[in-house]
Amino acid sequence: RMEKKLTEIFGINHLLPTHQGRACEHIIAQHFVKPDSCVIMNYHFTTSKAHVTRLGGRVEELVKDEGLIVKSNLPFKGNIDLDKVKACIEREGADNIAFLRLEAGTNLIGGQPISYENMKEATELAKSYGITTVLDASLLQDNLYFIKTREDSMKNKTIPEITRMVADLFDMIYFSGRKFGFGRGGGILIRDEKLFHEMEDYVTMFEGFLTYGGMSVKEMEALIIGFEETMDLDIISQGPQFIK
């Protein structure tokens, strides 16, 4: 049921269930990161960076410079700098880029959002070099709200429509259920069936059987309700920071 609901929302058929978000990061890093390889991010989260560096990889944080200016009213301070991304790929070589990870929104700089257009351009650039694209959707519900209210081309789109448009940009999407879904758990959605089967064993080794990945049935059922609520604009616009 959980996989079915996530497929309905994101349009990706293959789910690796985990007990929480950092377990997703562990599995992704185990599969992709090699010594001295590079992971490009708009901004890191503590565990996302730690899993990369633990395996001998490096993190390149390429959020736009203006994203770090505290006293500004820029609408999307989580945007990645596309010129820096291209320069990094050219310098490192595409084969040495483990993956591109975009975080929507950027937890450690105040949850600043990233625009749909920036995600689209960044993933297109990465894919032109054959680089896997990964979305950290843990804080996606807030980012969806900001895309709808701040991005002119999205004002007439529904939250489910925006979510699917964002999802269509990425090869993989992972999340912490405590944030996206309002419950305990996590998961990795993988678009490519071959890659999904290559990564299945990590769940069995580190999390549990593929049917639950360390979550109880109670937790999975609660997350299903949370996923539905995340698609409701009335619910995701209720944070105190959104009240004017």
Task: Cite the ranges covered by each PLM segment.
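Conserved PLP-enzyme active-site core in the AAT-like
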Residues: 2-244
